[in-house]
Amino acid sequence: MNQERLLQVILAPIVSEKSTMIAEKNQQVAFRVAKDATKPEIKAAVEMLFNVKVDGVSTVNVKGKVKRFGRTIGRRSDWKKAYVSLVDGQELDLTATPAAAE
């Protein structure tokens, strides 16, 4: 897999009440990923970016909601969510700030 492609797979971490509970209970982390990303690509991207070992990947295609803007009806885009399970003993803290260089 191409390193440039792996950098485009992970779009953003999902920080919500549900994803936080899953992270604490099951050692899983939720990410918003590219619509055309495959499970092996997601696994390789997480291992490369965060230097952790991945046990498995589950994906969900989330349908966009229909929203109204006054009289106009619009629709949000569909997107893909990935739940990444980490190997026992591995930890991924997305809220930590990088250490400042002294």
UniProtKB/Swiss-Prot annotation:
Q: Name one GO molecular function term.
A: structural constituent of ribosome
Please name the InterPro entries in this protein's record.
Answer: Nucleotide-bd_a/b_plait_sf, Ribosomal_uL23-like, Ribosomal_uL23/eL15/eS24_sf
Query: Which superkingdom does the taxonomy of this entry point to?
Result: Bacteria
Name a GO CC annotation attached to this entry: ribosome
Keyword Transcription assigned to the entry: answer is no
Q: Which GO terms describe its biological process?
A: translation
Pfam families recorded: Ribosomal_L23
Alphabetical keyword list: Ribonucleoprotein, Ribosomal protein, RNA-binding, rRNA-binding
| Family recorded in the similarity comment | Belongs to the universal ribosomal protein uL23 family.
Q: Note the NCBIfam families from the entry.
A: PRK05738.1-1 (NF004358), PRK05738.1-3 (NF004359), PRK05738.1-5 (NF004360), PRK05738.2-4 (NF004363), PRK05738.3-2 (NF004366)
What is the purpose of this protein?
One of the early assembly proteins it binds 23S rRNA. One of the proteins that surrounds the polypeptide exit tunnel on the outside of the ribosome. Forms the main docking site for trigger factor binding to the ribosome.
Q: Which PANTHER family does the record associate with it?
A: 60S RIBOSOMAL PROTEIN L23A
HAMAP family reported for this sequence: Ribosomal_uL23_B
Quaternary structure, per UniProt, is:
Part of the 50S ribosomal subunit. Contacts protein L29, and trigger factor when it is bound to the ribosome.
Q: Tell me what this protein is called.
A: Large ribosomal subunit protein uL23
